[in-house]
Amino acid sequence: MNDHQKNHATSQDDNTKSTPSKNSKHIKIKLWHFILVILGIILLTSIITVVSTILISHQKSGLNKEQRANLKKIEYVYQTLNKDYYKKQSSDKLTQSAIDGMVKELKDPYSEYMTAEETKQFNEGVSGDFVGIGAEMQKKNEQISVTSPMKDSPAEKAGIQPKDIVTQVNHHSVVGKPLDQVVKMVRGKKGTYVTLTIKRGSQEKDIKIKRDTIHVKSVEYEKKGNVGVLTINKFQSNTSGELKSAIIKAHKQGIRHIILDLRNNPGGLLDEAVKMANIFIDKGNTVVQLEKGKDKEELKTSNQALKQAKDMKVSILVNEGSASASEVFTGAMKDYHKAKVYGSKTFGKGIVQTIREFSDGSLIKYTEMKWLTPDGHYIHGKGIRPDVSISTPKYQSLNVIPDNKTYHQGEKDKNVKTMKIGLKALGYPIDNETNIFDEQLESAIKTFQQDNNLKVNGNFDKKTNDKFTEKLVEKANKKDTVLNDLLNKLK
């Protein structure tokens, strides 16, 4: 989409020729007079064209007189600073700052302006596609290691294995570099090559890998006894197609009860939420109502429900991280009594964002309307309450402690409570959850540091924080208490 459209006024010359009559020699028009007439016509036509173009432009812009004056003021300030400021300014930065200022004034966390690079990353997240090698990586013990290569990915075909330690990318050391920086080094243009120097056991070798388009699936299926668990990570392009395929596969395996796990699913594409609901809800039914002032629109299902889905009982698992499109889908399934909802109250995001892309690759994302469930429930700031509550262990809901500060005994801070809850979950003796850094916490930290080969000083420093977070994530991934509780309820 271009930044704006130009209106062009097109004129067509009259090419009809008139044949001179025999009396034409008696018609005496001085050449200079003829030229003046023609110039007058051209000038008049030009003035009319310019005025018409300006009027049309103003009408099509949708701006009133006051708004046009404000826009002119912004343009004047931009030109003045660009031309007359005593230090040379970047035109791009001035433009971005002006846009950022307007968006910030909205005080809306969901509206934002993105640069071309940020837009690229955003689109990758929406589509699920990116160019790379298809290797999941993590930073552990100050080393970059491969968690696992994706199936049929360039990394897998090249021989990359789980637990490989990456020491160099294109012969540049990655030791001490942040994980996101290493990932950027690995990614690049499709068809180009990247060389990873990997350490496997005591051996170190270079592996050359050709970059390709990688698709990250948004739906994962796992059979748990006689129940199928379908984890839906986000609503991206073709999430509904992936879900449909997973349901058909589960049905062939004899599964007649599925769990749709939407925990920590932040949402995504609204149309995918509607298509997903259509898997379970027949044609012609409203999935979501959209409202913008007095304007209202209903998004309905366009096909009959999937035959295999009609044979199945459906349970939906949500938590406070289930938001936006996750809530659209859950709300529709709940209103039509197509599923029983378990877990904890959802996030509560009942507004919809629209995207406008510019010709330079940047975009603006802004809130345009609110949405309601088929029965008219507005969940913004309220969330959707489950039919059956399953509480999440405290340690799984903890906020990450900022690593730019070291905490000592005697301090009073909200993050101290997080340390206590986390260490208690990891098996260390803590008998209170106050926000005061006491002797008991210091003793527990010393034991934790000793158990994990860290410097033993009783202070909660960056390295202790990193290991603390790592251990809690490992514990959460190892035993999903909420899912296990639901599976037990369904027996």
Swiss-Prot record:
Q: Which residues form the PDZ domain?
A: 119-201
Keywords of this entry? Cell membrane, Hydrolase, Membrane, Protease, Serine protease, Transmembrane, Transmembrane helix
The annotated regions of Polar residues compositional bias extend over 8-22
Question: What PROSITE patterns is this protein classified in?
Answer: PDZ
Q: Which GO terms describe its biological process?
A: proteolysis; signal transduction
Localization of this protein: Cell membrane
Q: Locate the region Disordered.
A: 1-22
Among Pfam families, the record links this protein to: CtpB_N-like, PDZ_6, Peptidase_S41, PG_binding_1
- Top-rank EC class of the record's enzyme: hydrolase
TM segments?
A: 31-51
Q: Name one GO molecular function term.
A: serine-type peptidase activity
Q: Does the keyword Nucleotide-binding apply?
A: no
Please provide one cellular component term from the Gene Ontology annotations of this protein: outer membrane-bounded periplasmic space
Q: How does it sit in the membrane?
A: Single-pass membrane protein
Which residues constitute the catalytic centre? S324, D335, K349
* Domain of life the protein comes from: Bacteria
UniProt xrefs under NCBIfam families: prc
Family per similarity comment: Belongs to the peptidase S41A family.
Any idea what this protein is called?
Answer: Probable CtpA-like serine protease
Origin species, per record, is Staphylococcus epidermidis (strain ATCC 35984 / DSM 28319 / BCRC 17069 / CCUG 31568 / BM 3577 / RP62A)
